[in-house]
Amino acid sequence: MQKVVKLHNIKIGNDLPFILIAGPCQIEGQDHALFMAEKLVKLTSKLDIPFIYKSSFDKANRTSINGVRGLGIEKGLEVLSKVKAEFDCPIVTDVHSESQCTETARVVDILQIPAFLCRQTDLLQAAAKTGKIVKVKKGQFLAPWDMKNVQTKLKAFGAENILFTERGTCFGYNNLVSDMRSLAIMAKLNVPVIFDATHSVQQPGGLGDSTGGERKYVELLAKAATTVGIAGMYMEVHQDPDNAPSDGPCMIKLDNLESILIKLKKYDKITKEK
Protein backbone atom coordinates (compact mmCIF):
# COMPACT_ATOMS: atom_id res chain seq x y z
CA MET A 1 0.00 0.00 0.00
CA GLN A 2 1.33 3.41 -0.96
CA LYS A 3 2.45 5.73 1.83
CA VAL A 4 0.06 8.59 2.57
CA VAL A 5 1.36 11.73 4.26
CA LYS A 6 -1.28 13.64 6.20
CA LEU A 7 -1.18 17.39 6.67
CA HIS A 8 -4.20 18.76 8.53
CA ASN A 9 -7.12 17.78 6.28
CA ILE A 10 -4.89 17.10 3.25
CA LYS A 11 -3.83 13.59 2.29
CA ILE A 12 -0.79 13.30 0.02
CA GLY A 13 -0.32 10.02 -1.81
CA ASN A 14 0.54 8.72 -5.26
CA ASP A 15 -2.82 6.93 -5.55
CA LEU A 16 -4.87 9.89 -4.30
CA PRO A 17 -6.10 12.98 -6.20
CA PHE A 18 -3.13 15.28 -6.75
CA ILE A 19 -2.40 18.23 -4.54
CA LEU A 20 -1.03 21.56 -5.76
CA ILE A 21 2.01 23.28 -4.29
CA ALA A 22 2.20 26.76 -5.80
CA GLY A 23 3.22 30.36 -5.28
CA PRO A 24 5.77 32.90 -6.51
CA CYS A 25 9.41 31.87 -6.64
CA GLN A 26 10.48 34.25 -3.90
CA ILE A 27 8.69 36.37 -1.31
CA GLU A 28 8.60 39.85 -2.81
CA GLY A 29 6.79 41.56 0.06
CA GLN A 30 3.75 41.13 2.28
CA ASP A 31 1.22 42.72 -0.08
CA HIS A 32 2.34 40.60 -3.02
CA ALA A 33 2.35 37.39 -0.98
CA LEU A 34 -1.16 38.03 0.34
CA PHE A 35 -2.37 38.88 -3.16
CA MET A 36 -0.95 35.68 -4.63
CA ALA A 37 -2.15 33.51 -1.77
CA GLU A 38 -5.69 34.88 -2.00
CA LYS A 39 -5.86 34.19 -5.74
CA LEU A 40 -4.46 30.68 -5.36
CA VAL A 41 -6.65 29.75 -2.39
CA LYS A 42 -9.78 30.90 -4.21
CA LEU A 43 -8.85 29.07 -7.41
CA THR A 44 -7.95 25.78 -5.77
CA SER A 45 -11.08 25.93 -3.61
CA LYS A 46 -13.16 26.45 -6.75
CA LEU A 47 -11.50 23.48 -8.46
CA ASP A 48 -11.47 21.32 -5.30
CA ILE A 49 -7.70 20.82 -5.37
CA PRO A 50 -5.87 20.53 -2.02
CA PHE A 51 -3.44 23.45 -1.85
CA ILE A 52 -0.14 24.26 -0.15
CA TYR A 53 1.40 27.73 -0.55
CA LYS A 54 5.09 27.94 -1.50
CA SER A 55 7.49 30.87 -1.61
CA SER A 56 11.15 31.32 -0.65
CA PHE A 57 12.63 33.80 1.82
CA ASP A 58 16.10 33.38 0.30
CA LYS A 59 17.23 32.28 -3.15
CA ALA A 60 20.65 31.26 -1.93
CA ASN A 61 21.86 29.72 -5.19
CA ARG A 62 21.32 32.58 -7.61
CA THR A 63 23.57 32.42 -10.69
CA SER A 64 25.03 35.90 -10.24
CA ILE A 65 26.14 37.95 -7.25
CA ASN A 66 23.71 40.57 -8.57
CA GLY A 67 20.68 38.26 -8.44
CA VAL A 68 17.89 39.33 -6.07
CA ARG A 69 17.81 36.82 -3.21
CA GLY A 70 14.67 37.79 -1.30
CA LEU A 71 13.61 39.22 2.06
CA GLY A 72 15.73 36.97 4.25
CA ILE A 73 14.61 34.56 6.93
CA GLU A 74 13.28 36.99 9.56
CA LYS A 75 11.10 39.13 7.30
CA GLY A 76 10.27 36.21 5.03
CA LEU A 77 8.92 34.03 7.82
CA GLU A 78 6.93 36.97 9.12
CA VAL A 79 5.21 37.25 5.73
CA LEU A 80 4.59 33.50 5.50
CA SER A 81 3.11 33.56 9.00
CA LYS A 82 0.64 36.24 7.91
CA VAL A 83 -0.28 34.27 4.80
CA LYS A 84 -0.96 31.22 6.95
CA ALA A 85 -3.05 33.18 9.45
CA GLU A 86 -5.01 35.06 6.79
CA PHE A 87 -5.92 32.11 4.58
CA ASP A 88 -5.51 29.08 6.85
CA CYS A 89 -3.44 27.28 4.24
CA PRO A 90 -0.38 25.08 4.81
CA ILE A 91 3.02 26.53 3.92
CA VAL A 92 6.22 25.08 2.46
CA THR A 93 9.51 26.91 2.08
CA ASP A 94 13.19 26.09 1.54
CA VAL A 95 15.92 25.82 4.13
CA HIS A 96 19.56 26.12 3.14
CA SER A 97 21.44 25.44 6.36
CA GLU A 98 20.99 23.52 9.59
CA SER A 99 20.64 26.77 11.55
CA GLN A 100 17.49 27.73 9.63
CA CYS A 101 15.49 24.56 10.30
CA THR A 102 14.18 25.09 13.83
CA GLU A 103 13.19 28.72 13.27
CA THR A 104 11.52 27.95 9.95
CA ALA A 105 9.65 24.97 11.40
CA ARG A 106 7.91 27.27 13.88
CA VAL A 107 6.04 28.83 10.96
CA VAL A 108 5.80 26.39 8.06
CA ASP A 109 4.30 22.92 7.72
CA ILE A 110 6.83 21.45 5.29
CA LEU A 111 10.58 22.02 5.08
CA GLN A 112 11.91 21.85 1.53
CA ILE A 113 15.47 20.72 0.86
CA PRO A 114 16.76 22.32 -2.37
CA ALA A 115 17.98 20.00 -5.13
CA PHE A 116 21.59 21.18 -4.89
CA LEU A 117 21.58 20.28 -1.17
CA CYS A 118 19.71 16.98 -1.25
CA ARG A 119 22.74 14.93 -0.14
CA GLN A 120 23.82 17.25 2.69
CA THR A 121 23.57 14.92 5.65
CA ASP A 122 23.66 17.57 8.38
CA LEU A 123 20.88 19.56 6.70
CA LEU A 124 18.72 16.44 6.32
CA GLN A 125 19.30 15.64 9.98
CA ALA A 126 18.36 19.13 11.16
CA ALA A 127 15.19 19.11 9.04
CA ALA A 128 14.18 15.65 10.26
CA LYS A 129 14.65 16.61 13.91
CA THR A 130 12.00 19.34 13.64
CA GLY A 131 9.31 16.69 13.22
CA LYS A 132 7.91 18.49 10.20
CA ILE A 133 7.23 16.92 6.82
CA VAL A 134 10.49 16.97 4.85
CA LYS A 135 10.20 17.52 1.10
CA VAL A 136 13.41 16.80 -0.81
CA LYS A 137 13.98 17.90 -4.39
CA LYS A 138 15.99 15.30 -6.30
CA GLY A 139 19.31 16.76 -7.39
CA GLN A 140 19.68 17.45 -11.09
CA PHE A 141 22.79 15.29 -10.88
CA LEU A 142 21.16 12.24 -9.24
CA ALA A 143 19.57 9.11 -10.63
CA PRO A 144 16.09 8.51 -9.19
CA TRP A 145 17.20 5.30 -7.47
CA ASP A 146 19.88 7.28 -5.64
CA MET A 147 17.09 8.91 -3.64
CA LYS A 148 16.93 5.69 -1.65
CA ASN A 149 20.04 6.91 0.16
CA VAL A 150 18.33 10.21 0.99
CA GLN A 151 15.32 8.30 2.30
CA THR A 152 17.55 6.07 4.44
CA LYS A 153 19.28 9.10 5.96
CA LEU A 154 16.00 10.82 6.81
CA LYS A 155 14.53 7.70 8.38
CA ALA A 156 17.68 7.19 10.42
CA PHE A 157 17.21 10.72 11.77
CA GLY A 158 13.58 10.05 12.71
CA ALA A 159 11.69 11.57 9.78
CA GLU A 160 8.38 9.77 9.34
CA ASN A 161 6.80 11.91 6.65
CA ILE A 162 8.90 12.38 3.52
CA LEU A 163 8.06 13.77 0.07
CA PHE A 164 10.29 13.56 -3.00
CA THR A 165 10.22 15.99 -5.90
CA GLU A 166 11.37 15.48 -9.49
CA ARG A 167 12.67 18.73 -11.01
CA GLY A 168 14.60 17.60 -14.08
CA THR A 169 18.02 16.12 -14.80
CA CYS A 170 21.09 17.76 -16.32
CA PHE A 171 21.23 17.17 -20.06
CA GLY A 172 24.41 18.77 -21.33
CA TYR A 173 25.19 22.37 -20.50
CA ASN A 174 22.49 24.87 -19.47
CA ASN A 175 19.73 22.35 -20.03
CA LEU A 176 17.48 19.93 -18.17
CA VAL A 177 15.38 17.01 -19.35
CA SER A 178 12.47 15.32 -17.56
CA ASP A 179 12.68 11.54 -17.36
CA MET A 180 9.15 10.45 -16.47
CA ARG A 181 10.49 7.08 -15.35
CA SER A 182 11.90 8.91 -12.32
CA LEU A 183 8.40 9.45 -10.96
CA ALA A 184 7.58 5.74 -11.01
CA ILE A 185 11.02 4.74 -9.69
CA MET A 186 10.83 7.09 -6.71
CA ALA A 187 7.23 6.04 -6.02
CA LYS A 188 8.52 2.47 -5.58
CA LEU A 189 10.41 3.73 -2.54
CA ASN A 190 6.95 4.16 -0.98
CA VAL A 191 7.27 7.93 -0.88
CA PRO A 192 4.70 10.39 -2.27
CA VAL A 193 6.20 11.99 -5.38
CA ILE A 194 5.72 15.57 -6.53
CA PHE A 195 6.50 16.83 -10.03
CA ASP A 196 8.03 20.30 -10.28
CA ALA A 197 6.72 21.43 -13.65
CA THR A 198 8.26 24.89 -13.67
CA HIS A 199 11.83 24.19 -12.55
CA SER A 200 11.90 21.27 -14.98
CA VAL A 201 11.89 23.76 -17.87
CA GLN A 202 14.83 25.74 -16.49
CA GLN A 203 17.93 26.45 -18.51
CA PRO A 204 20.40 26.82 -15.61
CA GLY A 205 22.66 29.80 -16.18
CA GLY A 206 21.24 29.95 -19.68
CA LEU A 207 21.10 33.75 -19.78
CA GLY A 208 24.72 34.16 -18.71
CA ASP A 209 24.15 35.86 -15.37
CA SER A 210 20.73 34.35 -14.68
CA THR A 211 18.68 31.26 -15.36
CA GLY A 212 16.60 30.96 -18.50
CA GLY A 213 13.62 28.75 -19.12
CA GLU A 214 10.99 27.57 -21.56
CA ARG A 215 7.63 28.34 -20.00
CA LYS A 216 5.82 27.07 -23.09
CA TYR A 217 6.66 23.47 -22.09
CA VAL A 218 5.35 23.61 -18.51
CA GLU A 219 1.84 22.44 -19.37
CA LEU A 220 3.14 19.69 -21.65
CA LEU A 221 5.41 18.23 -18.96
CA ALA A 222 2.75 18.62 -16.27
CA LYS A 223 0.30 16.60 -18.35
CA ALA A 224 2.87 13.89 -18.97
CA ALA A 225 3.75 13.64 -15.28
CA THR A 226 0.11 13.46 -14.26
CA THR A 227 -0.46 10.43 -16.48
CA VAL A 228 2.25 8.54 -14.59
CA GLY A 229 0.31 8.89 -11.34
CA ILE A 230 1.79 11.34 -8.85
CA ALA A 231 0.92 12.71 -5.44
CA GLY A 232 1.23 16.35 -6.34
CA MET A 233 2.10 19.07 -8.81
CA TYR A 234 4.52 21.88 -7.96
CA MET A 235 4.29 25.08 -9.96
CA GLU A 236 5.69 28.52 -9.39
CA VAL A 237 3.17 31.16 -10.38
CA HIS A 238 3.27 34.93 -10.80
CA GLN A 239 0.88 37.57 -12.11
CA ASP A 240 3.71 39.09 -14.18
CA PRO A 241 6.46 36.48 -14.52
CA ASP A 242 8.46 38.41 -17.11
CA ASN A 243 9.13 41.05 -14.47
CA ALA A 244 9.61 38.72 -11.50
CA PRO A 245 12.91 38.98 -9.59
CA SER A 246 13.79 35.29 -10.11
CA ASP A 247 12.81 32.35 -12.35
CA GLY A 248 10.55 34.53 -14.47
CA PRO A 249 11.14 32.54 -17.68
CA CYS A 250 9.89 29.38 -15.96
CA MET A 251 6.93 30.61 -13.95
CA ILE A 252 3.34 30.27 -15.11
CA LYS A 253 1.28 33.39 -15.52
CA LEU A 254 -1.45 33.47 -12.88
CA ASP A 255 -4.16 34.06 -15.48
CA ASN A 256 -3.22 30.82 -17.26
CA LEU A 257 -3.19 28.56 -14.22
CA GLU A 258 -6.89 27.67 -14.08
CA SER A 259 -7.06 26.22 -17.58
CA ILE A 260 -3.95 24.11 -16.89
CA LEU A 261 -5.33 22.77 -13.62
CA ILE A 262 -8.65 21.83 -15.19
CA LYS A 263 -6.80 19.70 -17.73
CA LEU A 264 -4.56 18.14 -15.09
CA LYS A 265 -7.58 17.15 -13.01
CA LYS A 266 -8.95 15.23 -15.99
CA TYR A 267 -5.65 13.45 -16.63
CA ASP A 268 -5.26 12.66 -12.93
CA LYS A 269 -8.76 11.18 -12.65
CA ILE A 270 -8.30 8.93 -15.68
CA THR A 271 -4.89 7.75 -14.48
CA LYS A 272 -6.13 6.82 -11.00
CA GLU A 273 -9.43 5.22 -11.93
CA LYS A 274 -9.60 1.71 -10.51
UniProtKB/Swiss-Prot annotation:
GO terms for molecular function: 3-deoxy-8-phosphooctulonate synthase activity. Pathway: Carbohydrate biosynthesis; 3-deoxy-D-manno-octulosonate biosynthesis; 3-deoxy-D-manno-octulosonate from D-ribulose 5-phosphate: step 2/3; Bacterial outer membrane biogenesis; lipopolysaccharide biosynthesis. Its main location: cytoplasm. GO terms for cellular component: cytoplasm. It catalyses: D-arabinose 5-phosphate + phosphoenolpyruvate + H2O = 3-deoxy-alpha-D-manno-2-octulosonate-8-phosphate + phosphate. HAMAP family: KDO8P_synth (MF_00056). This is 2-dehydro-3-deoxyphosphooctonate aldolase. The gene is kdsA.
